[in-house]
Amino acid sequence: MAILPIRIVGDPVLHEPTETVSESPAELSELIADMYDTMDAANGVGLAANQVGIPLRLFVYDCPDVDETGKPFRRRGCVVNPVLETSERPETMPDPDDDVEGCLSVPGEQFPTGRAEWAKVTGTDADGNAVEIEGRDFFARMLQHEVGHLDGFLYVDMLVGRNARAAKKTIKRAGWGVPGLSWVPGTVEDPFGHDD
């Protein structure tokens, strides 16, 4: 298995809708394993195929959640050809503390992002079996974030007001927003500080 370079905002593969997956589970197995390795090395909670330069409609996740009693646990899996359904997205400004979101393709940065409280994704898993996953709060945020990647946009594309202006300045200051930039987890310091 391999850790793959993660494309940075501005790379064309991140800004175009991905292609429907027609490959068999066997043909996808190495890519999916590499995506898990890459996500784990980056301490991510989700990773879309186009973030590693592959314009296919699939993502992997390893995301914290809470059960109905409030007990924390992790949900890990893969969804191929996901279809997203959500509750209504709030029209108010996102909370600067509760709605902060980050992205491995905008390394080290976080901005308040408005998301629906509930989301459900249907598709198939890594073995080709039908799958339906749903969640609330942070897990719902992750589902919306990853499907957004597959639809050709990043979370910074949906920011509003001062958050959009701040993201634009940050991207410009970092020299991002151009094709060909990437980073390889494990070869540089964790941009989100998980190495500390």
UniProtKB/Swiss-Prot annotation:
GO biological process: co-translational protein modification; translation
CC cofactor note: Binds 1 Fe(2+) ion.
Regions that span the bilayer: none
Keywords, ordered alphabetically: Hydrolase, Iron, Metal-binding, Protein biosynthesis
E.C. number: 3.5.1.88
PANTHER family: PEPTIDE DEFORMYLASE, PEPTIDE DEFORMYLASE, MITOCHONDRIAL
NCBIfam families xref list: pept_deformyl (TIGR00079), PRK00150.1-3 (NF001159), PRK12846.1-4 (NF009483)
Role description: Removes the formyl group from the N-terminal Met of newly synthesized proteins. Requires at least a dipeptide for an efficient rate of reaction. N-terminal L-methionine is a prerequisite for activity but the enzyme has broad specificity at other positions.
Protein name stated in the entry: Peptide deformylase
Species of provenance: Rhodococcus opacus (strain B4)
